[in-house]
A protein has these predicted regions:
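Extreme N-terminal starter segment of soluble prokaryotic enzymes
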Residues: 1-5
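Short helix-loop-beta junction
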Residues: 20-28
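Generic structural signal for residues in well-ordered beta-strands
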Residues: 29-32, 108
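Structural alpha-helical scaffold elements that stabilize or flank donor/cofactor-binding regions
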Residues: 38-39, 72
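An anion/phosphate-binding loop that grips the pyrophosphate of nucleotide cofactors and donors
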Residues: 42
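Structural motif
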Residues: 46-48
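Cysteine-nucleophile active-site neighborhood
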Residues: 51-127
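Amide-donor transfer/coupling interface in amidating biosynthetic enzymes
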Residues: 107-214
Length: 214
């Protein structure tokens, strides 16, 4: 039986993610843990997160998990979700400035306020609700139609320097990177565990992914 570890550092809707993973692939062992050995022993790892970036990095540091996450990123399939994706960039504007893990060359920026669509209507921040995702080819999009709608809740967004690392974009109102890819790492700004059948399909794809881009 293959296994997937969900990193528990005290910031994330872990129960919902674990339940969605179990539903997506009942034959996969789902382990919610902060134990470094258990994380490194798993076949795949999910790095979730909800909350403030400074708290995220502080919690990872307190649990001695920063190097663990970096090691996972070099050795096995890793899926970042929401704050977990943002933590993979160099730094974030949140809390003034917060250094992050640096897996992707880029920064986490706050949506400008007021935010207007082309019709002059004010868009709310945080960006909350369903939005379309335009895909770039990747195994985790298998059996998910392009422009499918996923569920978002965020006030900050990723801006990466290398466009080849962008696996998906969404508009609010301007295009922003909502999915990132690099070798065996895939990360999404949206919440697959809240995105109904397309979200479960993405999780199912991750749970059989070998970490290759083709």
């Amino acid at each position: 039986m293959s296994s997937v570890a969900v990193i528990d550092y005290g910031m994330g809707n872990l129960h919902s993610i674990a339940k969605a993973l179990q539903h997506a692939a009942p034959d996969v062992e789902v382990i919610v843990t902060s134990d470094a050995h258990a994380i490194l022993a798993a076949d795949r790892v999910v790095f979730p997160g909800v909350g403030a970036m400074r708290d995220c990095m502080q919690a990872l540091g307190d649990l001695n998990l920063i190097d663990v996450v970096k090691e996972v990123a070099n050795t096995k399939p890793l899926l970042g979700i929401c704050l977990g994706m943002q933590a993979m960039l160099l730094d974030s504007q949140e809390n003034g400035h917060t250094d992050c893990l640096g897996m992707f060359d880029g920064h986490v920026l706050k949506f400008a306020e007021p935010l207007e669509n082309p019709n002059g209507e004010i868009l709310k921040v945080p960006h909350m609700g369903w939005n379309q995702v335009k895909q770039t080819a990747h195994p985790l999009w298998k059996n998910i139609p392009d422009n499918s709608r996923f569920y978002f809740v965020h006030s900050y967004y990723a801006q990466v320097k290398n466009s080849s690392h962008i696996a998906g974009t969404s508009d609010y109102p301007n295009a922003f990177a909502c999915a990132l890819m690099k070798d065996n790492v895939f990360a999404v700004q949206f919440h697959p565990e809240k995105s109904q059948h397309v979200g479960l399909q993405l999780l199912a794809n991750f749970l059989v992914w070998d970490g290759l881009l083709v």
